């Protein structure tokens, strides 16, 4: 909550007391960026209605989601009803993720705890754990919808306990907001 508070609200936004110090794993950081720059992932344009998709990034997100579920423990997730949100600014990415989750038998016990939606579809909602797929990966540094920082404010403030962002820093670092967000996350990881 500290970064969005500083960037969007002049430091005046504070987490609610009941979630301020709440975490899932004692040794875990509350926010993590998985940089896909070295992975040679590429976005694809699939049309005006659905926008862009980055299948390799989506597949990595699902792999990281499974790892995180195993770290927390499946029985704990089910007992405590730890819920997960998966957010992307692009409808094509959301649809791809929904289809992959539906087809993955290992995720079946947790499906009722997953919400997969666009940033706009997530407005007003929160989840214990949020994964964000930023999709954009191109040499030109074009970021499209990601230029709309109001949407990014919504996306990065949906997590009650853990936020995981997947994105290509090489593409995003040309924009001040993403550069500062990445620096903030790296500083947390170094503490």
Task: Set out the residue ranges of the language-model regions.
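Helicase-core coupling region on the C-terminal RecA-like lobe
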Residues: 1-68, 125-126, 159, 164-191
